[in-house]
Amino acid sequence: MLITGFPAGLLACNCYVLAERPGTDAVIVDPGQGAMGTLRRILDKNRLTPAAVLLTHGHIDHIWSAQKVSDTFGCPTYVHPADRFMLTDPIYGLGPRIAQLVAGAFFREPKQVVELDRDGDKIDLGGISVNIDHTPGHTRGSVVFRVLQATNNDKDIVFTGDTLFERAIGRTDLAGGSGRDLLRSIVDKLLVLDDSTVVLPGHGNSTTIGAERRFNPFLEGLSR
């Protein structure tokens, strides 16, 4: 399976491209600010056709280019209904500093939006089966996307957005955030995964569930 990613924009949100192999359909996860140029190069180099845009949550650094990517390639954008409103109001609750960053920018919904309203659902996109788990805490509509046996050595992967990072967890002091919900989501939806599961977060380096279980200071004493 082809998996690649890059940090997009001033807030360095990780945008990911996932495809069964070159020359097939692709899934785009969290296309952030200015992602289109790098995305086009990856798509052209590997002869990929976007089949879907997946959003882990609605904050601006993760959805900035979603409408442009979705409408340019004629593919749907998938988002949890609790965060859908942020497609047109992506700075909701983020404060004046972020508002200054996007001064003058205009956001609208993609022409095709699909709501991820069933926790634990599985969808087939471009020949790839994606499992969706609702993980409220960072936002009410945060989700993680799991793909089984995705790596070259058949390890599972999980796109965690801003729920879980290398040695950190998502912030919960923004509108819609809840520390209690975040920890419950991590325990119930992430710490139940195999230690070998590769974590592809919304910011920073990749890691594994096992490494975070052992070394993440915010998860000390948590288990299921």
UniProtKB/Swiss-Prot annotation:
What's a Gene Ontology MF term here?
A: metal ion binding
Its cofactor is:
Zn(2+)
Positions bound to Zn(2+) 2: D61, H62, D162, H203
The record ties this protein, via InterPro entries, to: MBL_Glyoxalase_II, Metallo-B-lactamas, RibonucZ/Hydroxyglut_hydro
- Residues that, per the record, bind Zn(2+) 1: H57, H59, H138, D162
| Top-tier EC class | hydrolase
UniProt key word ATP-binding: no
Known EC number(s)? 3.-.-.-
Q: Could you give the cofactor binding note from the entry?
A: Binds 2 Zn(2+) ions per subunit.
| SMART domains in UniProt | Lactamase_B
Organism placement in taxonomy: Bacteria, Bacillati, Actinomycetota, Actinomycetes, Mycobacteriales
The entry's family comment says:
Belongs to the metallo-beta-lactamase superfamily. Glyoxalase II family.
Q: Which Pfam families match?
A: Lactamase_B (PF00753)
Which UniProt keywords are given for this protein, alphabetically ordered? Hydrolase, Metal-binding, Zinc
Statement: the UniProt record of this protein carries the keyword Chloroplast: no
UniProt cross-references to SUPFAM superfamilies, sorted A to Z: Metallo-hydrolase/oxidoreductase
Q: What is this protein called?
A: Uncharacterized protein Mb2612c
